[in-house]
């Protein structure tokens, strides 16, 4: 018999879905007492090499308020050629093309193994992909040269029919005309004045590309539509390569003590307007490269005086950041415009100081774009990360989807509260929309402009079935996820995932519900909720909310005697959850101390879009130990794991750190690894490096690589992440294990757990 752990794993691999609860409480009242809501982490484009797309369109329920897709949960009458919708119970006739179906000849969408299935839409034109480069020229020559080389490299990776455009900016904004032979021609705009899409259309003489009337059947291959500013790669490859090579640093002089005048806000506005006027609702990426903060015009984040530092968290808390609100408002308006027309905005920011990601974060967050942060464009971190944007699948197609929409349909007993992730609401009200909103709610449809195989949304549900209307024994609730998107091949595709879970009466079957708890998924779903709240609430308030939820969960599902904390026990399905919450409280997602606003925005951006595995690594980093006593092994993320004769490899998602213990570091300095008789030591030093390289080669964005040792300045990255079970206060305690004491006043996991148990038991007594 399959265990819940295996069931959860199989569902994630097949459907890209992880639920907080895999048996659902059958009434609204009982569901609210579960503390953690019924919710799911859903990866719309989960990679399935064994799932070839089907070359026909889905069969829909005929009821206009439903329109659910035929799926394995539907009841089928093969004789009468009828099927009953499992969401609204409407009986539907199969289309004539299904005349030959029978119990022995079922279409793929009725087979249980195809609970997720992808259809190819054969009608409508196939549009080319569009890439619009928006390049900051206010940077050092070395950085600009490296960026130019990376962009030239990317041109060679684009399909020949892809349309490309180029906008450069500094004090002025230049829109380059790429259709000119022999000369470089561009339109120059002032960087201090914003332009509406209509004004831009008139100034550039733009017109929308007409979309041909939708027709059924295979499309006749036509040359891709284009204009002077967006041209096919195959036509202007050489010209654009030369143009990029000739790009110079912004010519306007920068007086001493001043920052260069950088018009990022206007440049992005023109990019959004250009695509808005020419290719609305077509897959397009605006790829913006910035080397510093916007210092003039709409969207500016700091003045040009170098003596005035860019805002910090302290300034924002004291309401002393004069440009934040206005700058954020400008970029939010641009993000919403881009999301409406289905265009993606990527931001690649490389500088030693902040560049304004706090104000600009809504652009990638709302459009499903990438956010990359680094020190310089001339580092392997940026170069390899940018190259991975253009990763291709086994069929030679980019691993990216464009202009996606997600629609969710539910059984009558459950409704949708909202979604948290890289999406915007399409304001589609329906019978399955809950009045209680969580995240982006009040809708059953969302726009996801940019999708990758790991893009993951958190979807929150509300059980609405009343306590006095019991669900029959064996009843199941169903949810259908319908994702429509433009594939990188130009095809429109529809991926449909339909899942079902059992209902249970929480008064008589609480053990069944408890056994179905997915603590990993629940931790990520609650973390997303906490980070979403942290954007608008005070940090301490969010931590208090998180603590209250944890205490309530422990009281509901823990086993203990009144007023006896030592008796507290958690079943195996809940045992790791408090540990996840402990590390989440200490994480840079909720603790802004020692991080700039840009860094916090960057960390939160990635957490809100990554899948479960990567999100767990972000909350609780993985620690591996290498020593002579045995093969590499995972060890506790604890200060007791830091030993003199060990090498540690820590993966935090954003950093890959190799730490050499005191003895190992001394041997390395003495050069033992270079002596033939100490070859085993050389192998020991090399083992974590090889494992680190494996992670570095596969992750997006590429993590920062840190090689440090006992007493090294960068060892602080490890010391700040481990549980401080040994500190300067207890390092000489009797029976204390050996390890590295951490100089901190933070509480350890043990103290945290002791306090949690005590609080649960005492509060229980007070309630009794």
Curated annotation (Swiss-Prot):
Family matches, as Pfam families: Gelsolin, Sec23_BS, Sec23_helical, Sec23_trunk, zf-Sec23_Sec24
Gene3D superfamilies in UniProt: beta-sandwich domain of Sec23/24, Sec23/Sec24 helical domain, Severin, von Willebrand factor, type A domain, Zn-finger domain of Sec23/24
CDD domains: Sec23-like, Sec23_C
Subunit details: COPII is composed of at least five proteins: the Sec23/24 complex, the Sec13/31 complex and Sar1. Interacts with SEC23IP. Interacts with HTR4. Interacts with SEC16A. Interacts with SLC6A4. Interacts (as part of the Sec23/24 complex) with SEC22B; recruits SEC22B into COPII-coated vesicles and allows the transport of this cargo from the endoplasmic reticulum to the Golgi. Interacts (via Gelsolin-like repeat) with MIA2 and MIA3; specifically involved in the transport of large cargos like the collagen COL7A1. Interacts with DDHD1. Interacts with TMEM39A.
InterPro entries: ADF-H/Gelsolin-like_dom_sf (IPR029006), Gelsolin-like_dom (IPR007123), Gelsolin-like_dom_sf (IPR036180), Sec23 (IPR037364), Sec23/24_helical_dom (IPR006900), Sec23/24_helical_dom_sf (IPR036175), Sec23/24_trunk_dom (IPR006896), Sec23_24_beta_S (IPR012990)
Keywords annotated in UniProt: Acetylation, Cytoplasm, Cytoplasmic vesicle, Endoplasmic reticulum, ER-Golgi transport, Membrane, Metal-binding, Phosphoprotein, Protein transport, Transport, Zinc
Family of this protein: Belongs to the SEC23/SEC24 family. SEC23 subfamily.
N-acetylthreonine: residues carrying this PTM: 2
Domain of life: Eukaryota
An example molecular function term from Gene Ontology annotations: GTPase activator activity
Naturally occurring in which organism (per UniProt): Bos taurus
Gelsolin-like repeat segments: 632-718
Matching PANTHER family: PROTEIN TRANSPORT PROTEIN SEC23, PROTEIN TRANSPORT PROTEIN SEC23A
GO cellular component: COPII vesicle coat; cytosol; endoplasmic reticulum exit site; endoplasmic reticulum membrane
Membrane topology, as annotated: Peripheral membrane protein
Domain description: The Gelsolin-like repeat mediates interaction with proteins containing PPP motifs that include MIA2, MIA3 but also SEC31A. These interactions are probably competitive.
UniProt keyword annotation of Plastid present: no
Function according to Swiss-Prot or TrEMBL: Component of the coat protein complex II (COPII) which promotes the formation of transport vesicles from the endoplasmic reticulum (ER). The coat has two main functions, the physical deformation of the endoplasmic reticulum membrane into vesicles and the selection of cargo molecules for their transport to the Golgi complex. Required for the translocation of insulin-induced glucose transporter SLC2A4/GLUT4 to the cell membrane.
Keyword Glycoprotein appears in the UniProt entry: no
Protein name: Protein transport protein Sec23A
Residue list for modification Phosphothreonine: 308
Localization (cell): Cytoplasmic vesicle, COPII-coated vesicle membrane; Endoplasmic reticulum membrane; Cytoplasm, Cytosol
SUPFAM superfamilies xrefs: beta-sandwich domain of Sec23/24 (SSF81995), C-terminal, gelsolin-like domain of Sec23/24 (SSF82754), Helical domain of Sec23/24 (SSF81811), vWA-like (SSF53300), Zn-finger domain of Sec23/24 (SSF82919)
């Amino acid at each position: 018999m399959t265990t819940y752990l295996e069931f959860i794993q199989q569902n994630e691999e097949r459907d890209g879905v992880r639920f907080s609860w895999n048996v659902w409480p059958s009434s609204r009242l009982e569901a609210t007492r579960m503390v953690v809501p019924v919710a799911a982490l859903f990866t719309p484009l989960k990679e399935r090499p064994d799932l070839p797309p089907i070359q026909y369109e889905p069969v829909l329920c005929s009821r206009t308020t439903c329109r659910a897709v035929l799926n394995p949960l539907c009841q089928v009458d093969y004789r009468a050629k009828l099927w009953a919708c499992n969401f609204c119970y409407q009986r539907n006739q199969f289309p004539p093309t299904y005349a030959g179906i029978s119990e022995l000849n079922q279409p793929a969408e009725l087979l249980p193994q195809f609970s997720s299935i992808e259809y190819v839409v054969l009608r409508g034109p196939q549009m080319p992909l569009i890439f619009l480069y928006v390049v900051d020229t206010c940077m050092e020559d070395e950085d600009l040269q490296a960026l130019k080389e990376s962009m030239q490299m990317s041109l060679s990776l684009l399909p020949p029919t892809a349309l490309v455009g180029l906008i450069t900016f500094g004090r002025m904004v230049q829109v380059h005309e790429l259709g000119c032979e022999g000369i470089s021609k561009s339109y120059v705009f002032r960087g201090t004045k914003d332009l509406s899409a209509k004004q831009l259309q008139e100034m550039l003489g733009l017109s929308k590309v007409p979309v041909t009337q939708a027709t059924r059947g295979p499309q006749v291959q036509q040359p891709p539509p284009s204009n002077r500013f967006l041209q096919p790669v195959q036509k202007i490859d050489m010209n654009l390569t030369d143009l990029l090579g000739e790009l110079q640093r912004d010519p306007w002089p920068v007086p001493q003590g001043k920052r260069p005048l950088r018009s990022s806000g206007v440049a992005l506005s023109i990019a959004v307007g250009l695509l808005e006027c020419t290719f609305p609702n077509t897959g397009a990426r605006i790829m913006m490269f910035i080397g510093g903060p916007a210092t003039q015009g709409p969207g500016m984040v700091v003045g040009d005086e170098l003596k005035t530092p860019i805002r910090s968290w302290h300034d924002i808390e004291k309401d002393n950041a004069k440009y934040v609100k206005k700058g954020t408002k400008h970029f939010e308006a641009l993000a919403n415009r881009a999301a409406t027309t289905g265009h993606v905005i990527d931001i690649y920011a490389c500088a030693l100081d902040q560049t304004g990601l706090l104000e600009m974060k809504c652009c990638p967050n709302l459009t499903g774009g990438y956010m990359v942060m680094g020190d310089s464009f001339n580092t392997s971190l940026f170069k390899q990360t940018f190259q991975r944007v253009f990763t291709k699948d086994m069929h030679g197609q980019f691993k990216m989807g464009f202009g996606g929409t997600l629609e969710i349909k539910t059984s009558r007993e459950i409704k949708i509260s909202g979604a948290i992730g890289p999406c915007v609401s399409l304001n589609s009200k329906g019978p399955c929309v809950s009045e209680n909103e969580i995240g982006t709610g009040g809708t059953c449809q969302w726009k996801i402009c940019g999708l990758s195989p790991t893009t993951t949304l958190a979807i929150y549900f509300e059980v609405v079935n009343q306590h006095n209307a019991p669900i029959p024994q064996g009843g199941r609730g169903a949810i259908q996820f319908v994702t429509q998107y433009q594939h990188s091949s130009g095809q429109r595709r529809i991926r449909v995932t339909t899942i079902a879970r059992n209902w249970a009466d929480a008064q008589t079957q609480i053990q069944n519900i408890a056994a179905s708890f997915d603590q990993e998924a629940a931790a990520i779903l609650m973390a997303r909720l906490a980070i979403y709240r942290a954007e608008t609430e005070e940090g301490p308030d969010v931590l208090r909310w998180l603590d209250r939820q944890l205490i309530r969960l422990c009281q509901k599902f823990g086993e203990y005697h009144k007023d006896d904390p030592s008796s507290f026990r958690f079943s195996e399905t809940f045992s790791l959850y408090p540990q996840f919450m402990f590390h989440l409280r200490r994480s840079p997602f909720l603790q802004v101390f020692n991080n700039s606003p840009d860094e916090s925005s960057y960390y939160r951006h990635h957490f809100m879009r990554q899948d479960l595995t990567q999100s767990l690594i972000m909350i609780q980093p993985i620690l591996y130990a290498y020593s002579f006593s045995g093969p590499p092994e995972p060890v506790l993320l604890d200060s007791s794991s830091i030993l003199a004769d060990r090498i540690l490899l820590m993966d935090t998602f954003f950093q890959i750190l190799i730490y050499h213990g005191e003895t190992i570091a001394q041997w390395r300095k003495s050069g033992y690894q270079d002596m033939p008789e100490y070859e085993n030591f050389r192998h020991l030093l090399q083992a974590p490096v090889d494992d680190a390289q494996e992670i570095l080669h596969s992750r997006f964005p590429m993590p920062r690589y840190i090689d440090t040792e006992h007493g090294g300045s960068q060892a602080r990255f490890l010391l700040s992440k481990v549980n401080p079970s040994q500190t300067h206060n207890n390092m000489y305690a009797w029976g204390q294990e050996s390890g590295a004491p951490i100089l901190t006043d933070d509480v350890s996991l043990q103290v945290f757990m002791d306090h949690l148990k005590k609080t649960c038991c005492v509060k229980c007594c007070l309630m009794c």
